[in-house]
Amino acid sequence: GLVSAEDEIYTTNRLLELFRIEDYPYGFGEKIEQTEEEAVKRLPDLLTEMMDYAVENGILQEDGIVYRDLFDTKIMSCLVGRPSEIIRRFHEEYEKSPEAATDFFYKFSQDTDYIRRYRVCRDEKWVTPTKYGDLDITINLSKPEKDPKAIAAARLAKQGGYPKCLLCVENEGYAGRINHPARQNHRIIPLKINQADWFFQYSPYVYYNEHCIVFNDKHIPMKINKSTFKKLIEFTDMFPHYTLGSNADLPIVGGSILSLSLIHISEPTRLQLIS
């Protein structure tokens, strides 16, 4: 699980503080025995119950999907280890094999609810045969629709400059705001690629199988040149079970403006088209 036995009291007290509970009448140590599969299935309902409590008791001032996403991320942050702990564990698993390291990190990203399993499962996916071969088609339904109240609030909200974008390293542990998602349950793995600092993370929206992103520590516009291919090869040397590709070095890609050099990666259950 996310919480070791040594951290149970500490974690309980963090949750009590978050929910403004001064007394704990049920007594510490009362546990529900359940399998991992049952725990995964139970998580969204449990978070909903906790958020309902927060709304009813004035802890969560506004209700709605955006506000609930901000708050349930705060709940999960109480259960997530510090970045250094996750990085250390990742490297321990890498000593076994690259696959063991990414298996650990992907499952961790799901268990922390950074990747929301119960939303990702709504995505539509199918394979269509074409004269060029089988084509994987996906319709991503993981991103929640904002309610009108949240849209209006986001329009009026001050446009902050921190973090600089949705992908940069400063998002790790960020509390979020009405116009920027919370990332308190998010962890990033630092890498050295082409003698420069890069960072490895999974995408919360899973556009591809085990969809992850490697990005530069600096906000450098995306450029495709000789060094791009060197970076791609270096990464596949580190993680030979993944396939990857860079974004196009165009001013606007996928309807958004990219101010960060990044690479998309996927675990290829089939040959995949990577943007």
Region spans (language model):
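Active-site microenvironments that recognize anionic phosphate/pyrophosphate groups
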Residues: 1-224, 275
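Histidine-centered divalent metal-coordination motifs
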Residues: 216, 260-264
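Short, solvent-exposed loop/turn segments at the edges of secondary structure
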Residues: 207-208, 258-260
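Long, well-ordered alpha-helical scaffolding segments within enzyme catalytic domains
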Residues: 224-241
